[in-house]
């Protein structure tokens, strides 16, 4: 993938993607970030954008494939608002809707391998508004305050905020919430990629152990693992994603 103009793969509705990003916080297309050879937004927008007009073709992620519910809608760059008006609210790279679940997706490409993460969580997240069975997520929130450098590769604070946004959406919609962490492992990510990939996966496992069993279900999957699930016409799209973005 080379820099310059934003890349839109065949079958990805460019006008719709541009419209969505034009409304979103940061507008990565207008800012030029989308055209970067290492753009995370370009990977997410192309990977999920193909399903905007054909959501039923979107496969569920391997860790939650047992949901076996048909996908009814796919959105990209979607804001999930907290139960208050002011302040910042989480933006997820994609949201997948079924008749029973709302599945928020946080996609990562090079970010986990670019410097250590320091967690910061405002006092606003202490409000008792998240509903039942959120103890694990609240425990992670508190843990990150006492150990803000617990994770080097994983942006755990961002995931906590996303989970709280999904909990709020679940309270509104009545759908069961799932947060999927979809990560790439680009071979040019750093000087010792295999070592970094292993460390990243271990951090994911540690995080998962703390938040598992809660109302917002957490699952993690590699981009390559998800692309391997594409079937029929989508297999050509999966091939194009792999060849263009090497996730």
Predicted regions and their residues:
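Active-site beta-strand-loop-beta-strand hairpin of nuclease catalytic cores
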Residues: 95-104, 167-172
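Nuclease-adjacent, charged terminal/linker segments that flank catalytic cores
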Residues: 1-77, 81
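Polybasic (Lys/Arg-rich)
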Residues: 184, 193-247
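A short acidic (Asp/Glu
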Residues: 115-117, 163, 189-200
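Acidic, metal/cofactor-coordinating or nucleic-acid-engaging core segments within structured domains
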Residues: 114-179
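Active-site metal-binding core of divalent-cation-utilizing nuclease and nuclease-like domains
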Residues: 70-99
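A short, conserved, highly charged catalytic patch centered on acidic carboxylates
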Residues: 94, 108-119
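Short, solvent-exposed loop/turn segments at secondary-structure junctions
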Residues: 79-85, 101, 108-112, 166, ...
């Amino acid at each position: 993938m080379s820099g310059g103009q934003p890349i839109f793969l065949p079958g990805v509705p460019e006008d719709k993607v541009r419209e969505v990003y034009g409304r979103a916080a940061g507008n990565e297309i207008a800012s030029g970030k989308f055209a970067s050879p290492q753009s995370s937004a370009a990977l997410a927008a192309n990977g999920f954008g193909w399903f905007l007009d054909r959501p039923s073709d979107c496969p569920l992620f391997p860790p939650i494939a047992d949901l076996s519910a048909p996908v009814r809608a796919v959105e990209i760059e979607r804001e999930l608002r907290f139960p208050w008006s002011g302040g910042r609210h989480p933006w997820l790279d994609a949201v997948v809707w079924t008749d029973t679940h709302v599945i928020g997706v946080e996609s990562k490409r090079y970010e986990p391998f670019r410097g250590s993460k320091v967690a910061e969580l405002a006092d606003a997240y202490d409000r008792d508004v998240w509903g039942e069975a959120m103890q694990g997520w609240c425990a992670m929130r508190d843990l990150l305050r006492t150990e803000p450098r617990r994770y080097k590769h994983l942006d755990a604070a961002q995931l906590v905020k996303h989970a709280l946004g999904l909990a709020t959406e679940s309270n509104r919609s009545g759908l069961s919430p799932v947060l999927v962490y979809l990560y790439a492992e680009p071979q040019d990510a750093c000087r010792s990629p295999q070592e970094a990939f292993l460390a990243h996966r271990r951090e994911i496992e540690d995080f998962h152990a703390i938040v598992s069993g809660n109302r917002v279900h957490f699952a993690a999957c590699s981009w390559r693992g998800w692309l391997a699930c594409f079937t029929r016409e989508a297999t050509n799209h999966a091939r194009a994603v792999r060849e263009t973005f090497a996730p």
